Design a protein with these regions (language model features):
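Glycine-rich phosphate-binding loop used to anchor ATP phosphates in small-molecule kinases
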Residues: 54-104
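Conserved substrate/cofactor phosphate-moiety recognition/catalytic segment
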Residues: 16-75
Length: 435
Protein backbone atom coordinates (compact mmCIF):
# COMPACT_ATOMS: atom_id res chain seq x y z
CA UNK A 1 0.00 0.00 0.00
CA UNK A 2 1.04 3.63 -0.34
CA UNK A 3 3.67 3.77 2.40
CA UNK A 4 7.23 5.08 2.07
CA UNK A 5 9.73 4.28 4.83
CA UNK A 6 13.03 6.17 4.98
CA UNK A 7 15.75 4.79 7.23
CA UNK A 8 17.86 7.45 8.94
CA UNK A 9 21.11 6.85 10.75
CA UNK A 10 24.85 7.18 10.35
CA UNK A 11 26.94 4.23 9.11
CA UNK A 12 27.20 1.46 11.69
CA UNK A 13 23.81 1.99 13.33
CA UNK A 14 22.51 -1.30 11.95
CA UNK A 15 20.05 -0.19 9.27
CA UNK A 16 20.83 -2.91 6.73
CA UNK A 17 21.04 -5.57 9.45
CA UNK A 18 17.65 -4.44 10.74
CA UNK A 19 16.17 -4.84 7.24
CA UNK A 20 17.60 -8.34 6.96
CA UNK A 21 16.42 -9.38 10.42
CA UNK A 22 12.88 -8.12 9.65
CA UNK A 23 12.83 -9.93 6.27
CA UNK A 24 12.24 -6.67 4.39
CA UNK A 25 14.87 -6.93 1.65
CA UNK A 26 12.26 -7.46 -1.07
CA UNK A 27 10.65 -4.10 -0.24
CA UNK A 28 13.92 -2.16 -0.03
CA UNK A 29 15.88 0.07 -2.39
CA UNK A 30 19.46 0.53 -1.17
CA UNK A 31 21.72 3.36 -2.32
CA UNK A 32 24.85 1.33 -1.52
CA UNK A 33 23.61 -1.67 -3.51
CA UNK A 34 22.99 0.57 -6.51
CA UNK A 35 26.49 2.03 -6.12
CA UNK A 36 27.92 -1.50 -6.31
CA UNK A 37 25.77 -2.24 -9.36
CA UNK A 38 27.26 0.80 -11.09
CA UNK A 39 30.86 0.09 -10.06
CA UNK A 40 32.75 -2.53 -8.09
CA UNK A 41 34.81 -1.43 -5.03
CA UNK A 42 37.87 0.72 -5.77
CA UNK A 43 41.27 0.84 -4.05
CA UNK A 44 41.74 3.98 -1.94
CA UNK A 45 44.87 5.84 -0.80
CA UNK A 46 45.04 3.77 2.39
CA UNK A 47 45.41 0.64 0.30
CA UNK A 48 41.90 -0.59 1.12
CA UNK A 49 38.80 -1.11 -0.98
CA UNK A 50 35.72 1.07 -0.57
CA UNK A 51 32.49 1.93 -2.37
CA UNK A 52 32.96 4.73 -4.89
CA UNK A 53 30.79 7.85 -4.54
CA UNK A 54 31.68 9.15 -8.00
CA UNK A 55 28.54 7.70 -9.60
CA UNK A 56 26.14 9.20 -7.07
CA UNK A 57 24.39 11.33 -9.67
CA UNK A 58 23.50 8.23 -11.66
CA UNK A 59 22.82 6.21 -8.52
CA UNK A 60 20.22 8.59 -7.13
CA UNK A 61 18.65 9.16 -10.53
CA UNK A 62 18.19 5.40 -10.87
CA UNK A 63 16.93 5.03 -7.31
CA UNK A 64 14.28 7.72 -7.81
CA UNK A 65 13.30 6.19 -11.15
CA UNK A 66 12.80 2.78 -9.55
CA UNK A 67 11.01 4.37 -6.62
CA UNK A 68 8.55 6.19 -8.86
CA UNK A 69 7.75 2.97 -10.72
CA UNK A 70 6.93 1.36 -7.39
CA UNK A 71 4.90 4.34 -6.25
CA UNK A 72 2.87 4.31 -9.46
CA UNK A 73 1.73 0.84 -8.41
CA UNK A 74 1.25 1.88 -4.79
CA UNK A 75 3.90 -0.45 -3.42
CA UNK A 76 5.19 -0.41 0.16
CA UNK A 77 8.82 0.71 -0.17
CA UNK A 78 11.79 1.21 2.15
CA UNK A 79 14.81 3.36 1.26
CA UNK A 80 18.05 2.24 2.92
CA UNK A 81 20.35 5.26 3.07
CA UNK A 82 21.78 7.53 5.78
CA UNK A 83 19.44 10.49 5.04
CA UNK A 84 21.58 12.62 7.35
CA UNK A 85 20.61 15.92 5.74
CA UNK A 86 17.07 17.19 6.05
CA UNK A 87 17.29 18.22 2.40
CA UNK A 88 17.81 14.58 1.39
CA UNK A 89 14.49 13.64 2.98
CA UNK A 90 12.78 16.67 1.44
CA UNK A 91 13.73 15.31 -1.97
CA UNK A 92 10.98 12.69 -1.65
CA UNK A 93 8.18 15.15 -0.91
CA UNK A 94 7.10 15.75 -4.51
CA UNK A 95 6.61 12.02 -5.13
CA UNK A 96 4.85 11.55 -1.78
CA UNK A 97 2.33 14.24 -2.71
CA UNK A 98 1.95 13.10 -6.31
CA UNK A 99 1.15 9.50 -5.39
CA UNK A 100 -0.65 10.24 -2.10
CA UNK A 101 1.78 8.31 0.09
CA UNK A 102 2.33 8.32 3.82
CA UNK A 103 5.99 8.88 4.68
CA UNK A 104 7.74 7.51 7.75
CA UNK A 105 11.29 8.01 9.00
CA UNK A 106 12.78 5.17 11.06
CA UNK A 107 15.24 7.00 13.31
CA UNK A 108 18.36 5.06 14.40
CA UNK A 109 19.95 8.03 16.21
CA UNK A 110 19.50 6.40 19.63
CA UNK A 111 22.34 4.03 18.77
CA UNK A 112 25.37 5.43 20.70
CA UNK A 113 28.11 6.98 18.56
CA UNK A 114 30.70 4.64 20.09
CA UNK A 115 28.63 1.63 19.06
CA UNK A 116 28.29 2.93 15.50
CA UNK A 117 32.05 3.54 15.27
CA UNK A 118 32.81 0.03 16.53
CA UNK A 119 30.33 -1.61 14.15
CA UNK A 120 31.70 0.42 11.25
CA UNK A 121 35.22 -0.90 11.88
CA UNK A 122 33.89 -4.48 12.04
CA UNK A 123 32.09 -4.30 8.70
CA UNK A 124 33.46 -5.73 5.47
CA UNK A 125 36.38 -3.63 4.28
CA UNK A 126 34.61 -2.10 1.28
CA UNK A 127 31.65 -1.01 3.46
CA UNK A 128 33.73 0.89 6.02
CA UNK A 129 33.82 4.70 6.04
CA UNK A 130 36.26 7.03 7.86
CA UNK A 131 35.47 7.74 11.53
CA UNK A 132 35.23 11.44 10.66
CA UNK A 133 32.30 10.70 8.33
CA UNK A 134 30.45 8.80 11.06
CA UNK A 135 31.04 11.69 13.51
CA UNK A 136 29.81 14.31 11.03
CA UNK A 137 26.66 12.40 10.08
CA UNK A 138 25.82 11.65 13.70
CA UNK A 139 26.03 15.34 14.63
CA UNK A 140 23.99 16.42 11.60
CA UNK A 141 21.20 13.94 12.30
CA UNK A 142 20.94 15.17 15.90
CA UNK A 143 20.86 18.82 14.81
CA UNK A 144 18.52 18.53 11.80
CA UNK A 145 15.10 17.03 12.60
CA UNK A 146 13.15 15.18 9.94
CA UNK A 147 10.62 17.35 8.03
CA UNK A 148 7.22 17.80 9.65
CA UNK A 149 5.39 16.07 6.76
CA UNK A 150 6.97 12.77 7.82
CA UNK A 151 6.15 10.62 10.84
CA UNK A 152 9.23 9.69 12.87
CA UNK A 153 9.33 6.31 14.62
CA UNK A 154 12.00 4.25 16.35
CA UNK A 155 13.10 0.84 15.00
CA UNK A 156 11.39 -0.97 17.88
CA UNK A 157 8.07 0.72 17.00
CA UNK A 158 8.06 -0.45 13.40
CA UNK A 159 6.22 -3.77 13.80
CA UNK A 160 3.31 -2.16 15.62
CA UNK A 161 3.04 0.98 13.47
CA UNK A 162 3.42 -0.87 10.17
CA UNK A 163 0.52 -3.23 10.70
CA UNK A 164 -2.77 -2.48 8.94
CA UNK A 165 -5.37 -3.32 11.56
CA UNK A 166 -9.16 -3.54 11.23
CA UNK A 167 -11.22 -0.83 12.87
CA UNK A 168 -14.45 -1.43 14.77
CA UNK A 169 -17.54 0.08 13.15
CA UNK A 170 -20.18 -1.14 15.60
CA UNK A 171 -21.19 2.45 16.39
CA UNK A 172 -23.13 2.59 13.12
CA UNK A 173 -26.72 1.36 13.00
CA UNK A 174 -26.21 0.06 9.47
CA UNK A 175 -23.45 -0.10 6.86
CA UNK A 176 -24.27 0.31 3.17
CA UNK A 177 -21.71 -1.04 0.68
CA UNK A 178 -22.55 0.31 -2.77
CA UNK A 179 -21.08 -1.21 -5.92
CA UNK A 180 -19.79 0.29 -9.17
CA UNK A 181 -21.88 3.35 -10.12
CA UNK A 182 -20.28 4.14 -13.50
CA UNK A 183 -21.94 7.50 -14.01
CA UNK A 184 -25.48 6.27 -13.26
CA UNK A 185 -26.93 8.77 -10.79
CA UNK A 186 -30.66 8.12 -11.07
CA UNK A 187 -30.46 4.52 -9.89
CA UNK A 188 -28.07 5.51 -7.09
CA UNK A 189 -30.41 8.26 -5.92
CA UNK A 190 -33.29 5.79 -6.10
CA UNK A 191 -31.54 3.51 -3.63
CA UNK A 192 -30.51 6.33 -1.30
CA UNK A 193 -33.96 7.96 -1.53
CA UNK A 194 -32.28 11.34 -1.81
CA UNK A 195 -30.54 11.37 1.56
CA UNK A 196 -27.90 9.82 3.82
CA UNK A 197 -28.68 8.88 7.41
CA UNK A 198 -26.24 10.29 9.97
CA UNK A 199 -26.10 7.10 12.04
CA UNK A 200 -25.36 4.87 9.05
CA UNK A 201 -22.11 4.37 7.13
CA UNK A 202 -21.92 4.51 3.33
CA UNK A 203 -19.04 2.78 1.56
CA UNK A 204 -18.69 3.13 -2.22
CA UNK A 205 -16.52 0.43 -3.81
CA UNK A 206 -15.19 2.62 -6.63
CA UNK A 207 -15.61 3.26 -10.36
CA UNK A 208 -17.97 6.15 -9.78
CA UNK A 209 -17.56 7.48 -13.33
CA UNK A 210 -17.38 6.50 -17.02
CA UNK A 211 -19.68 4.54 -19.33
CA UNK A 212 -22.91 5.92 -17.86
CA UNK A 213 -24.61 9.10 -19.06
CA UNK A 214 -25.01 10.97 -15.75
CA UNK A 215 -21.37 11.55 -14.82
CA UNK A 216 -21.79 15.23 -13.97
CA UNK A 217 -24.64 14.44 -11.58
CA UNK A 218 -22.53 11.76 -9.91
CA UNK A 219 -19.63 14.20 -9.44
CA UNK A 220 -21.97 16.84 -8.04
CA UNK A 221 -23.30 14.25 -5.59
CA UNK A 222 -19.78 13.21 -4.56
CA UNK A 223 -18.80 16.83 -3.97
CA UNK A 224 -21.81 17.21 -1.69
CA UNK A 225 -20.90 14.19 0.48
CA UNK A 226 -17.09 14.01 0.33
CA UNK A 227 -16.57 15.73 3.70
CA UNK A 228 -19.07 13.62 5.63
CA UNK A 229 -17.55 11.37 8.30
CA UNK A 230 -19.99 8.57 7.46
CA UNK A 231 -18.88 8.30 3.81
CA UNK A 232 -15.93 6.27 2.52
CA UNK A 233 -15.01 6.37 -1.16
CA UNK A 234 -12.85 3.53 -2.46
CA UNK A 235 -10.65 4.09 -5.48
CA UNK A 236 -11.54 2.16 -8.61
CA UNK A 237 -9.52 1.88 -11.80
CA UNK A 238 -11.71 4.51 -13.50
CA UNK A 239 -11.44 6.98 -10.63
CA UNK A 240 -7.82 7.87 -11.39
CA UNK A 241 -9.13 9.83 -14.37
CA UNK A 242 -10.86 12.19 -11.96
CA UNK A 243 -7.50 13.03 -10.37
CA UNK A 244 -5.93 13.54 -13.79
CA UNK A 245 -8.84 15.74 -14.85
CA UNK A 246 -8.47 17.90 -11.75
CA UNK A 247 -4.76 18.43 -12.46
CA UNK A 248 -5.26 18.98 -16.23
CA UNK A 249 -3.11 15.92 -16.92
CA UNK A 250 -3.27 13.75 -20.02
CA UNK A 251 -5.81 10.94 -19.67
CA UNK A 252 -5.23 7.82 -21.73
CA UNK A 253 -8.84 6.69 -21.87
CA UNK A 254 -10.97 7.15 -24.95
CA UNK A 255 -14.15 6.60 -22.91
CA UNK A 256 -13.27 9.35 -20.44
CA UNK A 257 -11.97 11.76 -23.08
CA UNK A 258 -14.88 11.34 -25.49
CA UNK A 259 -17.79 10.90 -23.09
CA UNK A 260 -17.10 11.69 -19.45
CA UNK A 261 -14.85 14.73 -19.85
CA UNK A 262 -17.27 16.68 -22.08
CA UNK A 263 -19.98 16.14 -19.44
CA UNK A 264 -17.73 17.47 -16.69
CA UNK A 265 -16.55 20.39 -18.83
CA UNK A 266 -20.11 21.42 -19.58
CA UNK A 267 -21.00 21.29 -15.89
CA UNK A 268 -18.20 23.78 -15.17
CA UNK A 269 -16.77 22.21 -12.03
CA UNK A 270 -14.02 24.06 -10.19
CA UNK A 271 -10.85 22.01 -10.71
CA UNK A 272 -9.82 22.73 -7.11
CA UNK A 273 -12.98 20.98 -5.92
CA UNK A 274 -12.21 18.04 -8.22
CA UNK A 275 -8.68 17.77 -6.80
CA UNK A 276 -10.03 17.78 -3.24
CA UNK A 277 -12.53 15.08 -4.17
CA UNK A 278 -9.79 12.92 -5.73
CA UNK A 279 -7.84 13.07 -2.46
CA UNK A 280 -10.79 11.56 -0.59
CA UNK A 281 -10.50 8.14 -2.23
CA UNK A 282 -9.27 5.29 -0.02
CA UNK A 283 -7.35 2.15 -0.96
CA UNK A 284 -9.25 -0.34 1.20
CA UNK A 285 -11.80 -0.66 4.01
CA UNK A 286 -10.93 -3.27 6.64
CA UNK A 287 -13.20 -3.47 9.66
CA UNK A 288 -15.09 -5.55 12.18
CA UNK A 289 -18.81 -5.35 12.82
CA UNK A 290 -20.33 -7.61 15.42
CA UNK A 291 -18.51 -10.94 15.33
CA UNK A 292 -17.43 -10.68 11.69
CA UNK A 293 -14.44 -9.17 9.90
CA UNK A 294 -14.87 -7.53 6.50
CA UNK A 295 -12.42 -6.53 3.81
CA UNK A 296 -13.66 -4.29 1.01
CA UNK A 297 -11.64 -3.46 -2.10
CA UNK A 298 -12.54 -2.40 -5.60
CA UNK A 299 -10.96 -5.28 -7.50
CA UNK A 300 -11.21 -8.22 -5.11
CA UNK A 301 -8.29 -10.12 -3.59
CA UNK A 302 -7.42 -13.80 -3.27
CA UNK A 303 -6.84 -13.90 0.51
CA UNK A 304 -6.18 -11.70 3.51
CA UNK A 305 -2.37 -11.48 3.81
CA UNK A 306 -0.59 -11.25 7.15
CA UNK A 307 0.09 -7.55 6.57
CA UNK A 308 -2.06 -5.61 4.11
CA UNK A 309 0.51 -2.80 3.97
CA UNK A 310 2.77 -5.05 1.90
CA UNK A 311 0.14 -5.37 -0.85
CA UNK A 312 0.41 -3.03 -3.82
CA UNK A 313 -2.49 -0.61 -4.16
CA UNK A 314 -2.70 -1.55 -7.85
CA UNK A 315 -3.78 -5.04 -6.78
CA UNK A 316 -6.43 -3.66 -4.46
CA UNK A 317 -7.80 -1.55 -7.30
CA UNK A 318 -7.42 -3.92 -10.26
CA UNK A 319 -7.80 -7.11 -8.27
CA UNK A 320 -5.61 -10.16 -7.84
CA UNK A 321 -5.49 -12.25 -11.00
CA UNK A 322 -7.09 -11.28 -14.30
CA UNK A 323 -10.48 -9.83 -15.12
CA UNK A 324 -11.58 -13.36 -15.98
CA UNK A 325 -10.60 -14.76 -12.56
CA UNK A 326 -13.46 -16.01 -10.40
CA UNK A 327 -12.01 -14.20 -7.42
CA UNK A 328 -15.04 -14.87 -5.22
CA UNK A 329 -14.54 -18.63 -5.15
CA UNK A 330 -10.75 -18.24 -4.98
CA UNK A 331 -11.08 -16.09 -1.86
CA UNK A 332 -13.60 -18.45 -0.28
CA UNK A 333 -11.33 -21.44 -0.86
CA UNK A 334 -8.23 -19.69 0.48
CA UNK A 335 -10.00 -18.32 3.57
CA UNK A 336 -11.70 -21.56 4.60
CA UNK A 337 -11.94 -21.76 8.37
CA UNK A 338 -11.48 -18.02 8.90
CA UNK A 339 -14.32 -15.66 9.79
CA UNK A 340 -13.54 -13.06 7.11
CA UNK A 341 -15.93 -11.75 4.45
CA UNK A 342 -14.90 -10.04 1.22
CA UNK A 343 -16.95 -7.44 -0.68
CA UNK A 344 -15.74 -6.05 -4.01
CA UNK A 345 -16.81 -4.64 -7.37
CA UNK A 346 -14.96 -4.24 -10.69
CA UNK A 347 -15.38 -7.67 -12.32
CA UNK A 348 -18.01 -10.34 -12.75
CA UNK A 349 -17.40 -12.14 -16.01
CA UNK A 350 -19.38 -15.17 -14.88
CA UNK A 351 -22.49 -13.11 -14.00
CA UNK A 352 -22.45 -14.38 -10.43
CA UNK A 353 -25.15 -13.23 -7.99
CA UNK A 354 -24.38 -10.65 -5.33
CA UNK A 355 -23.62 -13.40 -2.81
CA UNK A 356 -21.17 -14.90 -5.26
CA UNK A 357 -19.49 -17.40 -2.92
CA UNK A 358 -19.71 -18.40 0.71
CA UNK A 359 -17.30 -15.70 1.89
CA UNK A 360 -17.45 -13.20 -0.98
CA UNK A 361 -19.96 -10.66 -2.29
CA UNK A 362 -19.70 -9.28 -5.84
CA UNK A 363 -21.13 -5.80 -6.52
CA UNK A 364 -20.44 -5.56 -10.26
CA UNK A 365 -23.87 -5.68 -11.94
CA UNK A 366 -23.36 -3.97 -15.34
CA UNK A 367 -25.32 -0.98 -14.12
CA UNK A 368 -24.06 1.20 -16.98
CA UNK A 369 -25.55 -1.18 -19.57
CA UNK A 370 -29.02 -1.25 -18.07
CA UNK A 371 -28.12 -3.85 -15.48
CA UNK A 372 -28.34 -3.37 -11.73
CA UNK A 373 -26.77 -1.26 -9.04
CA UNK A 374 -25.72 -3.78 -6.43
CA UNK A 375 -25.69 -3.06 -2.71
CA UNK A 376 -24.89 -5.00 0.44
CA UNK A 377 -26.09 -3.80 3.84
CA UNK A 378 -24.75 -4.95 7.19
CA UNK A 379 -26.59 -4.47 10.47
CA UNK A 380 -27.28 -6.32 13.72
CA UNK A 381 -29.52 -8.82 11.93
CA UNK A 382 -26.85 -9.77 9.38
CA UNK A 383 -26.18 -9.16 5.69
CA UNK A 384 -28.80 -8.21 3.10
CA UNK A 385 -28.28 -7.94 -0.67
CA UNK A 386 -30.04 -5.63 -3.13
CA UNK A 387 -30.16 -5.16 -6.90
CA UNK A 388 -31.76 -2.00 -8.27
CA UNK A 389 -32.52 -1.95 -12.01
CA UNK A 390 -31.03 0.97 -13.93
CA UNK A 391 -33.33 2.42 -16.57
CA UNK A 392 -31.23 5.47 -17.48
CA UNK A 393 -28.44 4.37 -19.81
CA UNK A 394 -27.26 4.72 -23.37
CA UNK A 395 -28.26 1.88 -25.65
CA UNK A 396 -25.43 0.88 -27.95
CA UNK A 397 -24.98 -1.38 -30.93
CA UNK A 398 -24.85 -5.13 -30.19
CA UNK A 399 -21.35 -6.44 -29.47
CA UNK A 400 -19.33 -7.73 -32.37
CA UNK A 401 -19.51 -11.25 -31.00
CA UNK A 402 -23.27 -11.32 -31.58
CA UNK A 403 -24.71 -12.85 -34.75
CA UNK A 404 -26.55 -10.35 -36.96
CA UNK A 405 -28.75 -11.85 -39.64
CA UNK A 406 -28.39 -10.13 -43.04
CA UNK A 407 -25.88 -7.67 -41.57
CA UNK A 408 -22.35 -7.29 -42.89
CA UNK A 409 -19.58 -6.01 -40.64
CA UNK A 410 -18.10 -2.91 -42.28
CA UNK A 411 -14.71 -1.31 -41.65
CA UNK A 412 -16.49 1.79 -40.36
CA UNK A 413 -18.51 -0.30 -37.88
CA UNK A 414 -15.37 -2.09 -36.68
CA UNK A 415 -13.41 1.16 -36.20
CA UNK A 416 -16.29 2.72 -34.30
CA UNK A 417 -16.40 -0.35 -32.06
CA UNK A 418 -12.68 0.02 -31.30
CA UNK A 419 -13.03 3.76 -30.58
CA UNK A 420 -15.82 3.16 -28.07
CA UNK A 421 -14.26 0.09 -26.44
CA UNK A 422 -13.41 0.63 -22.76
CA UNK A 423 -10.16 -1.32 -22.96
CA UNK A 424 -8.80 -0.12 -26.31
CA UNK A 425 -6.80 3.09 -26.64
CA UNK A 426 -5.43 4.54 -29.85
CA UNK A 427 -1.73 5.23 -30.27
CA UNK A 428 -0.97 7.56 -33.17
CA UNK A 429 2.20 6.77 -35.11
CA UNK A 430 4.07 8.59 -37.86
CA UNK A 431 2.59 8.75 -41.34
CA UNK A 432 -1.02 8.89 -40.20
CA UNK A 433 -0.90 5.32 -38.88
CA UNK A 434 -2.73 4.31 -35.72
CA UNK A 435 -2.10 1.29 -33.56
Amino acid sequence: MRTLVLLRGCPGTGKSTWIRDHHLNQYTLSADQLRLIHQSPVLNLEGKYDISQKNDGKVWKLLFSLLEERMERGEFTIIDATHAKQSMISGYKALVLKYRYRAYVVDFSDIPLETALLRNRERAEHKQVPDSVVHAMHERILSEPAPSWTTVIKPEEFDDVMQYKPRRLDSYKKIHVIGDVHGCFTVLDSYLKGRLEDDELYIFTGDMLDRGIENAKVVQFLLSIKDRKNVILLEGNHDKYLKQYGHDEETRSSVFNKKTKPELDEAGFDKKDIRELARRFHQIVYFTYGEDTYIITHGGISALPDNLLFMATSQLINGVGGYETDIDHVFTKNMEGRNIIQIHGHRNMFRLPVHAAAKSYNLEGQVEHGGHLRVVTIDRSGIQTYEIKNNVFKTSAPPLTSHHEHEELTVEHFLKHLEEHDYVSEQKLAGGISS
